[in-house]
A protein has these predicted regions:
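Predominantly soluble domains enriched in secretory-pathway, periplasmic, or organellar proteins
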Residues: 1-293
Length: 293
């Protein structure tokens, strides 16, 4: 039985009662009973002119609320499913073509990456009456970006030690942003175009993978010095990484080798692995206890 259709991503409410998915076509979100998978609400992403927009960047918030972005419409919306029969939606300006988004680990901010313009859209979830605001608005101005082989995933951004580490679109850089001011404080040169910049759970390191043709490489950044300390070749087609909850191991999907490889984060050596047919995302159950997924 097909319920969600061409869902491009999903999230679960805090109480575990609802599964909500986002759709490209037709644009919108759908809520399902987590036990029966019965459709309980269908919320179209309808724009002012009556067309429907692709939905991206879906994340759970406190209660039965979900936040998401509308690509064509340039909006951010929050839908409250406290009464699934009568969902209530708030709308905010989102900038031009938001393509992905994340909620910061403390649950306070929702940040959407913008494909159609420089900068990012930020909403303070503790102060919704202030609406959205633009951050890093000058990023990329006056520079010639490289061709984009793969869009970075914002869920692969990291927040560690009061700094956010963001993959730069079309550049061989990781941006460092102060999370108090949301201003850029540094740029770290890396081997190629970053896709994921993921923090070890203790925040001491950022592990970075890259777009094709350099997707067999991984680099490690020291968050104290802001320098690349290790350059690794774990396998062919490294698409995703996930740390164990205490950070002593990282699992990497090597799609083109049909393997998942396991590295010791202290020694940077492979300590295990197993066969898997074209592995992509790796997700551990520890995510179930984190807001924004």
């Amino acid at each position: 039985m097909v319920q969600a259709g061409n869902a491009i991503g999903g999230s679960i409410s805090h109480d575990g009662s609802l599964v909500v998915v986002q759709n490209y076509e037709p644009g919108g979100i759908k809520a399902f009973d987590a036990n029966t998978l019965e459709l309980v609400a269908d919320v179209p992403a309808t724009t002012e002119d009556g067309t429907r927009s692709k939905v991206v960047g879906l994340a759970d918030l406190s209660g039965k609320r979900f936040i998401y972005s509308l690509f064509e419409a340039g909006e951010i919306r929050i839908t409250d499913f406290s009464d699934p029969a009568k969902p209530v939606t708030q709308r905010f300006a989102g900038g031009k073509q938001p393509y992905d988004a994340l909620v910061t680990p403390d649950g306070r901010y929702y940040i959407a990456g913008l494909f159609g313009e420089d900068g990012l859209a930020l909403i303070d979830l503790w102060n919704l009456d202030k609406g959205s605001r633009k951050i890093l608005s000058g990023y990329g101005r006056g520079e010639q970006p490289l061709p984009v082989f793969k869009m970075p995933h914002l869920r692969g951004w990291s927040v560690a030690g009061g700094r956010a580490y963001l993959p730069a679109i079309g550049r061989h850089e990781v941006l460092v942003v102060d999370t108090d001011t949301w201003e850029e404080v540094d740029r770290i040169k890396v081997k190629s175009q970053p896709v994921f910049a993921m923090a070890r759970p203790d925040g001491r390191e950022i592990w970075v993978n890259f777009a094709f043709p350099d997707n067999g490489w991984v680099q490690v950044i020291d968050t104290v010095t802001g320098k690349v300390t290790d350059t690794l070749q774990p396998g062919r087609g490294i698409l995703h990484m996930e740390f164990l909850s205490k950070g002593h191991e990282v699992w990497l999907s090597a799609r083109d080798d049909n393997k998942v490889v396991i590295f010791d984060t202290a020694t940077k050596k492979q300590i295990g692995g197993f066969d898997s047919a074209s592995p992509s995302g790796i997700f551990f159950t520890t995510r179930a206890a984190r807001t924004g997924f």
